[in-house]
């Protein structure tokens, strides 16, 4: 995924440079004129002129279609749909009613202001004007696309108040600063239902997002790569249906396929082992093997045939760590790199071969123009591609001179956020120490991801150094986040790409809360803050250790390990086991975990507040109830972790009680304390299983089941040899509690029962039969 290792360092450096040279937007930036009147619009329009008064909008108003507009146009359909669905309002069919909403298309109706980068004509196609008076609302688009966007703004503007709907008198003229606004939807490790994906496309259009890049990996029924197809996978007809649905709403559905790296989902299969760059690594294709291109071209054909009407294709050339290095019996890249002059030119050759095939099929290819290419390698690239990222002042002017346009790439969530994005950050004092790097590294202080994205997009030197086409907002699901958690970042990040000089990010966040959840929302910002902070503590509340739970890691971005190295997992300090003859404990578990336990108590109280807010908003908000149900399931996962920590503390207390009773020769009481400790352990298991089942039920309302076999197909359960994505560790939803399953509480329980029974026998007390079955995740048992 993007923004890792060298890429992440580069982005961080460039942002720091930006902040120094240009100055970040202050948190106290002036509120927009619309927000000051209680109106929420996202993205914020370019030009707003408001009168002094608001006026009422009712179902007595009627619709009038002007030049260039037909009754079946999507702008007309969308206006009717959204008025009915969001506001329970149907416009009058009587043309004699007092108010009129007039829709029209007129070329050059809106003249763009300062265009700082990009294709002015393409930007003008998306422009619209909105004139608002007490008896007439007129939306005029330069094209049908602009008209559609004007409709979305009108619907967003309608403000419920005291049982009525209001609009501000005035005029809006609006257009985008960047032509293409892509969000990345990650279905690599799960598959959303088709209706969920359709709704995602429609939601995207509401925020003027005009492209969704969908990563499916094995969740598509490839004709030319049948072994990789997973138990649940979109059919070609379904992908075409999804494509057509997006185009209806002026949203491009962009296929996303990795290569040469990040292809363990292909190369793990024995049928494709001969295509590996290194025989013992499934991470990367051999770029000199003709069969690599034959396979990729077949997969391209399958995707293109099911994506007719699409314009773009994301050829994800992400993190090709080892390209040009291999020299073994099945791959001779090193020789070719030497012939070409560098591994960067070797990479450029792979990009050119694959992209030219797609270009010949009529697609504009978005790729990642990055390491190991250097500026003097870029002249080997054709100019018909789009670089999906900016790469800094050393590279961007070279891409520009080469005629290669670029996207401003950033992420609403990366590879270190578990269960929920870092929209808000914990204060420094609330963090627990952790590793200095890697996925379990504690969160660094900062303004939160929305402001980080806003600063990067609005203040990037690429506005001067590159020929910008658009933005790319990624929502990575490497660690298994649900895409529903990413909408705040998708909408606010893309809003800055539409209007670079948008008001401050906090204002955009508040506008999103109003628009996404509708009227009746209570302290939504606080709910997101608590979700973010609880997610950070969920990750940091466990320690990190080397693991044998999966095969070792073959290499990293800058090295091939001579001997593969263990990956990492999370754990907690082990519970002490009583020893004979007096149930002696070797150490004080509470002391080892003092700060962890203190903070768990505080976060449990905050979890109470979070659950109250989610339940309140489930009762009161009008829209996105499933989103809130999902947040409830995540909040319960947070809570289960907190309660487990505190229950382990209670177990520790019972062990101490047993030791104390044994020291006073109170055998009956000592055994009873041990029995209570074992009962607490069983309670942790039961609660964990109940929360997992509830989360699974909720997530499967929008996902197909993660299973080993279905529809005559089997999932090949093998991990990536270089990357360690948490959902790949399990076939099912148990990745949500994976670290708990690895925690050796079963071993502790077995040894504690043995110690208990040995002590009981010595004091003529009954033995106890007990099996914790810690790894069992089925129905809870008494």
What label would you give each PLM region?
Residues 2-13:
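Bacterial N-terminal signal peptides that target proteins for export
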Residues 11-22:
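Bacterial N-terminal signal peptides
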Residues 24-28:
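Sec/Tat signal peptide C-region and signal peptidase I cleavage site
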Residues 29-178:
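Contiguous, structured surface segment used for ligand recognition
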Residues 35, 41-44, 49-51, 59, ...:
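Substrate-binding groove of N-acetylhexosamine-processing glycoside hydrolases
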Residues 98, 102, 220-229, 373-377:
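Beta-rich nucleic-acid/ligand-interaction surfaces
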Residues 107-109, 260-261, 318-322, 371-374, ...:
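Short, internal active-site loops enriched in acidic
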Residues 177-367, 388, 398:
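Substrate-binding cleft of carbohydrate-active enzyme catalytic domains
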């Amino acid at each position: 995924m993007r923004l890792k290792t060298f890429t992440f360092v580069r982005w961080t450096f460039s942002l720091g440079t930006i902040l120094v040279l240009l100055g970040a937007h202050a948190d106290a930036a002036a509120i927009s004129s619309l927000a000051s009147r209680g109106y929420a619009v996202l993205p914020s329009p370019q030009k707003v002129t408001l009168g002094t008064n608001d006026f009422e909008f009712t179902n007595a108003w009627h619709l009038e279609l002007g030049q260039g507009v037909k009754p079946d146009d999507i702008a007309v359909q969308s206006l009717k749909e959204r008025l009915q669905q969001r506001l329970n309002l149907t416009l009058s069919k009587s043309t004699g009613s007092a108010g009129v909403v007039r829709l029209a298309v007129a070329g050059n109706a809106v003249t763009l202001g300062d265009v700082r980068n990009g294709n002015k004509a393409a930007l003008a196609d998306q422009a619209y004007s909105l004139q608002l008076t007490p008896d007439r609302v007129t939306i005029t688009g330069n094209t049908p696309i602009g008209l559609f966007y004007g409709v979305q703004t009108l619907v967003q503007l309608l403000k419920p108040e005291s049982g009525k709907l209001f609009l501000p008198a005035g005029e809006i003229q609006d257009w985008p600063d960047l032509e293409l606004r892509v969000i990345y939807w990650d279905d690599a490790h799960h598959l959303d239902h088709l209706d969920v994906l359709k709704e995602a496309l429609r939601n995207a259009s509401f925020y003027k997002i005009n492209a969704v890049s969908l990563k499916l990996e094995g969740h598509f029924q490839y004709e030319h790569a049948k072994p990789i197809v997973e138990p649940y996978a979109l059919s070609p007809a379904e992908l075409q249906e999804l494509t057509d649905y997006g185009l209806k709403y002026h949203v491009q559905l962009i296929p996303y396929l990795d290569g040469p790296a990040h292809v363990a989902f292909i190369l793990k299969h024995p049928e494709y082992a001969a295509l590996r760059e290194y025989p013992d690594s499934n991470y990367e294709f051999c770029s000199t093997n003709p069969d690599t291109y034959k396979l990729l071209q077949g997969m391209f054909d399958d995707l293109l045939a099911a994506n007719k009407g699409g314009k773009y294709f994301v050829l994800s050339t992400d993190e090709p760590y080892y390209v040009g290095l291999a020299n073994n019996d099945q791959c001779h890249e090193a020789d070719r790199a030497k012939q070409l002059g560098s591994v960067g030119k070797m990479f450029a050759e792979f990009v050119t071969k694959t992209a030219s095939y797609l270009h010949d099929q009529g697609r504009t290819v978005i790729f990642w123009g990055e390491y190991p290419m250097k500026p003097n390698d870029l002249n080997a690239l054709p100019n018909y591609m789009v670089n999906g990222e900016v790469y800094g002042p050393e590279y961007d002017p070279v891409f520009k001179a080469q005629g290669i346009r670029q996207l401003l790439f950033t992420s609403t969530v990366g590879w270190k956020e578990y269960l929920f994005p870092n929209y808000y950050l914990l204060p420094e004092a609330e963090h627990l120490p952790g590793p200095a790097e890697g996925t379990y590294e504690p969160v660094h202080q900062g303004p939160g991801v929305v402001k980080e994205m806003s600063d990067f997009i609005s203040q990037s030197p690429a506005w001067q150094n590159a020929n910008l086409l658009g933005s790319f907002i990624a929502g990575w699901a490497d660690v298994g986040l649900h895409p529903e958690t990413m909408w705040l970042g998708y909408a606010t990040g893309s809003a800055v790409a539409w209007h670079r000089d948008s008001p401050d990010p906090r204002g955009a966040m508040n506008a999103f809360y109003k628009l996404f959840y509708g009227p009746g929302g209570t302290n939504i910002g606080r709910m997101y803050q608590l979700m973010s902070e609880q997610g950070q503590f969920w990750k940091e509340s466990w320690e990190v250790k080397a693991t044998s739970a999966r095969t070792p890691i073959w290499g990293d971005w800058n090295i091939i390990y001579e001997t593969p190295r263990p990956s990492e997992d999370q754990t907690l300090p082990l519970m002490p086991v009583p020893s004979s003859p007096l149930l002696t404990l070797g150490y004080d578990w509470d002391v080892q975990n003092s700060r962890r336990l203190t903070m768990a108590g505080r976060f449990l109280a905050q979890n109470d507040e979070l659950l109250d807010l989610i339940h309140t908003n489930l009762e009161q908000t009008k829209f996105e109830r499933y989103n809130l149900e999902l947040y409830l399931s995540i909040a319960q996962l947070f809570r289960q972790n907190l309660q487990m920590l505190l229950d382990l503390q209670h177990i520790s207390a019972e062990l101490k009680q047993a030791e104390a009773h044994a020291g006073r020769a109170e055998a009956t009481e000592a055994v009873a304390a041990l029995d209570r400790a074992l009962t607490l352990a069983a309670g942790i298991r039961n609660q964990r299983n109940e929360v997992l089942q509830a989360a699974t039920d909720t997530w499967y309302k929008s996902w197909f089941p993660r299973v080993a076999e279905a529809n005559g197909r089997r999932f090949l359960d093998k991990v990536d040899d270089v990357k360690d994505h948490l959902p790949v560790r399990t076939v099912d939803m148990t990745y949500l509690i994976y670290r708990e399953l690895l925690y050796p509480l079963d071993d502790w329980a077995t040894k504690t029962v043995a110690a208990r029974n040995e002590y009981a026998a010595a004091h003529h007390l009954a033995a106890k039969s007990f099996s914790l079955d810690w790894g069992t995740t089925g129905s809870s048992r008494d």
